[in-house]
């Protein structure tokens, strides 16, 4: 699925003696090339395993939820769907903010596996549109395995009476995991301007999922706002109360670490 995004916004100032070559953003940026090269066969294998397990569990749990469905559950199920979308949106923002703002690619294990894609994305925002389904969704599938496994265990071990009582809660958890699983796919669609399925553009236009115009706000350096990337519903209210800025001030005051220092380092790489 190919696409092109508008320029990622104003970028960090570079020294005057840097060449035009060093000022390029996108796939030819020195930092983007280095980060892309860190994607390893081992990482690919982990993503494949995560996707297969995740979607197997989704299918298993969905069948059980459908078999247990009753009309009288409808109001609580609707509430669970909305609540699941809201919680998923907040969690997507929390993870996105944490990975964008703190840590380093040099950290053991999580650096190359988890933080690396966030650094690459700010330098080359359209790289995500060149990622296939496995690379796009592998990490999110890994994260949602635990709640999906727990749900499958309950369906296998709990009595019908207990499952009847738990049904609204399990619908909430299932919706939360579905939105969580597809968050990066939704994020990819927000960067894709050509060839999107019609139903995806409808969901974006209705703001059921993250719209393309909405997400552009985040891609203005230094990438310090609008972190929620599932539905984007919480971005404006969190910005109004200065939620992320207050968290950053608190952490910087306690640790002395400067927000987005590693992100800026990669953005300024020229060779």
Swiss-Prot record:
Keywords: Endoplasmic reticulum, Fatty acid metabolism, Lipid metabolism, Membrane, Oxidoreductase, Transmembrane, Transmembrane helix. Disruption phenotype: Body weight is reduced in homozygous deficient male and female. Deficient mice lack plasmanylethanolamine desaturase activity and have dramatically lowered plasmalogen levels in their tissues. GO terms for molecular function: plasmanylethanolamine desaturase activity. The chain crosses the membrane at residues 48-68, 75-95, 166-186. It catalyses: a 1-(1,2-saturated alkyl)-2-acyl-sn-glycero-3-phosphoethanolamine + 2 Fe(II)-[cytochrome b5] + O2 + 2 H(+) = a 1-O-(1Z-alkenyl)-2-acyl-sn-glycero-3-phosphoethanolamine + 2 Fe(III)-[cytochrome b5] + 2 H2O; a 1-O-hexadecyl-2-acyl-sn-glycero-3-phosphoethanolamine + 2 Fe(II)-[cytochrome b5] + O2 + 2 H(+) = a 1-O-(1Z-hexadecenyl)-2-acyl-sn-glycero-3-phosphoethanolamine + 2 Fe(III)-[cytochrome b5] + 2 H2O; a 1-O-octadecyl-2-acyl-sn-glycero-3-phosphoethanolamine + 2 Fe(II)-[cytochrome b5] + O2 + 2 H(+) = a 1-O-(1Z-octadecenyl)-2-acyl-sn-glycero-3-phosphoethanolamine + 2 Fe(III)-[cytochrome b5] + 2 H2O; a 1-O-(9Z-octadecenyl)-2-acyl-sn-glycero-3-phosphoethanolamine + 2 Fe(II)-[cytochrome b5] + O2 + 2 H(+) = a 1-O-(1Z,9Z-octadecadienyl)-2-acyl-sn-glycero-3-phosphoethanolamine + 2 Fe(III)-[cytochrome b5] + 2 H2O. Changing residue 96 to A: Loss of plasmanylethanolamine desaturase activity. Does not affect endoplasmic reticulum membrane localization. It holds the Pfam family Lipid_desat. Its main location: endoplasmic reticulum. GO terms for cellular component: endoplasmic reticulum membrane. Changing residue 131 to A: Strongly reduces plasmanylethanolamine desaturase activity. Does not affect endoplasmic reticulum membrane localization. Changing residue 187 to A: Loss of plasmanylethanolamine desaturase activity. Does not affect endoplasmic reticulum membrane localization. Residues 1-25 are annotated as: Disordered. Pathway: Lipid metabolism; fatty acid metabolism. A motif (Histidine box-2) lies at residues 214-218. Signal peptide: none annotated. It is found in: Endoplasmic reticulum membrane. Changing residue 121 to A: Loss of plasmanylethanolamine desaturase activity. Does not affect endoplasmic reticulum membrane localization. Its EC number is 1.14.19.77. A motif (Histidine box-1) lies at residues 187-191. Changing residue 215 to A: Loss of plasmanylethanolamine desaturase activity. Does not affect endoplasmic reticulum membrane localization. Plasmanylethanolamine desaturase involved in plasmalogen biogenesis in the endoplasmic reticulum membrane. Plasmalogens are glycerophospholipids with a hydrocarbon chain linked by a vinyl ether bond at the glycerol sn-1 position, and are involved in antioxidative and signaling mechanisms. Histidine box-1 and -2 together with other histidine residues are essential for catalytic activity. PANTHER family: PLASMANYLETHANOLAMINE DESATURASE 1, TRANSMEMBRANE PROTEIN 189. This is Plasmanylethanolamine desaturase 1. It comes from Mus musculus.
């Amino acid at each position: 699925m190919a696409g092109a995004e508008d320029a990622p916004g104003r970028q960090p100032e570079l020294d005057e003696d840097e060449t035009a070559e060093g000022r390029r953003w996108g796939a030819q940026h020195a930092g983007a090339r280095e980060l892309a090269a860190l994607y390893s066969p081992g990482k690919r294998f982990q993503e494949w395993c995560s996707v297969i397990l995740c979607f197997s569990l989704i299918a298993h749990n969905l069948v059980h939820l459908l078999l247990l469905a009753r009309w009288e559950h409808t109001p609580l199920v609707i509430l669970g769907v909305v609540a699941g979308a809201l919680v998923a949106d907040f969690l997507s923002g929390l993870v996105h903010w944490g990975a964008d703002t703190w840590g380093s690619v040099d950290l053991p294990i999580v650096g190359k596996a988890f933080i690396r894609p966030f650094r690459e994305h700010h330098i080359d925002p359209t790289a995500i549109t060149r990622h296939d389904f496995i690379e796009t969704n592998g990490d999110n599938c890994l994260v949602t395995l635990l709640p999906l496994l727990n749900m499958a265990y309950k369906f296998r071990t709990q009595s019908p009476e207990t499952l009847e009582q738990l049904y609204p809660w399990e619908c909430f958890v299932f919706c939360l995991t579905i939105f969580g699983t597809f968050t990066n796919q939704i994020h990819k669609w927000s960067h894709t301007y050509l060839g999107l399925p019609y139903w995806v553009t409808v969901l974006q236009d209705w703001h059921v999922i993250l719209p393309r115009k909405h997400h552009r706000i985040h891609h203005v350096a230094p990438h310090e706002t609008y972190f929620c990337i599932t539905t984007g519903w919480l971005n404006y209210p969190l910005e109004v109360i200065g939620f992320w800025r207050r968290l950053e001030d608190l952490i910087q005051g306690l640790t002395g670490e400067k927000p987005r220092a590693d992100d800026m380092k990669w953005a300024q790489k020229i060779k």
